[in-house]
Curated annotation (Swiss-Prot):
Annotated disulfide bonds: none
Enzyme class: translocase
Protein's name according to its UniProt entry: Na(+)-translocating NADH-quinone reductase subunit D
Predominant localisation class: membrane
Membrane topology, as annotated: Multi-pass membrane protein
Catalysed reactions, as listed in the record: a ubiquinone + n Na(+)(in) + NADH + H(+) = a ubiquinol + n Na(+)(out) + NAD(+)
Function: NQR complex catalyzes the reduction of ubiquinone-1 to ubiquinol by two successive reactions, coupled with the transport of Na(+) ions from the cytoplasm to the periplasm. NqrA to NqrE are probably involved in the second step, the conversion of ubisemiquinone to ubiquinol.
Organism: Chlamydia abortus (strain DSM 27085 / S26/3)
Length: 213
């Protein structure tokens, strides 16, 4: 498998052609919870990229000495190690974001993308392609999260990355009762579900049109 694909293909395929949330429909549950703001979505995307890339690398590195009978538990131990590392890193250097993400950083271990890449690819290819695929799978997951979070934060709070983009003077007040009001639905998890559904639908349309050509 490794001989037939370039490093470039291993990195680029998960970003679009084999995007895990949009094509494989994986990692959807956490996407509903962490896309309220761009900060949390970006942090989660980078955290998953780190965990998936590093765990895939070590799963591949140990693939020839890992018996099939303990394959899954070995993968879980490796993934857990890197989840703990990123969780402690966020608590030490980005405490506010870590507090906002709460248990969802620890729940990266249950993210189907991480185990999926380790099981379906990392144990079958050398370490470098495994790392590139894992890291890019996380980035592919991350850009989907960020896209959803930009829409949710802008319409839900009027901000992007905490910066106020909709001027305060546009908002409803006693002097201007008919002014703008934030779209409260965007703050709720169902909005992420519908936005992801629209993105998946759009990607499927683009792929079907491309296949017809």
């Amino acid at each position: 498998m490794a001989a037939n694909k370039s490093y470039k293909s291993y990195f680029l395929d998960p970003l679009w052609n084999n995007n895990q949330p949009l094509i494989a429909i994986l990692g959807i549950c956490s996407a509903l919870a962490v896309t309220t703001t761009v900060n949390t979505a970006l942090t989660m995307g980078l955290a998953v990229s780190f965990v998936t890339g590093c765990s895939s690398f070590f799963v591949s590195l140990l693939r020839k000495v890992t018996p099939d009978s303990v394959r899954m538990i070995t993968q879980l131990i490796i993934i857990s190690l890197f989840v703990i590392v990123i969780d402690q890193f966020l608590k030490a250097f980005f405490f506010d974001i870590s507090k906002t993400l709460s248990v969802f950083v620890g729940l990266i271990i249950t993210n189907c993308i991480v185990m999926g890449r380790a099981e379906s690819l990392a144990r079958n290819v050398p370490p470098i392609p495994a790392f590139l695929d894992g890291f890019a799978s996380g980035l592919g997951y991350g850009w989907v999260l960020v896209t959803v979070s930009i829409i949710r934060e802008f319409f839900g709070f009027g901000t992007i990355l905490g910066l106020q983009l909709i001027p305060k003077c546009f908002y409803a007040s006693e002097a201007h009762p008919d002014g703008y009001e934030n779209f409260g639905l965007m703050v709720l998890a169902p909005s992420a579900f519908f936005l992801l559904g629209i993105m998946i639908w759009g990607v499927n349309i683009l792929r079907s049109k491309k296949e017809r050509r």
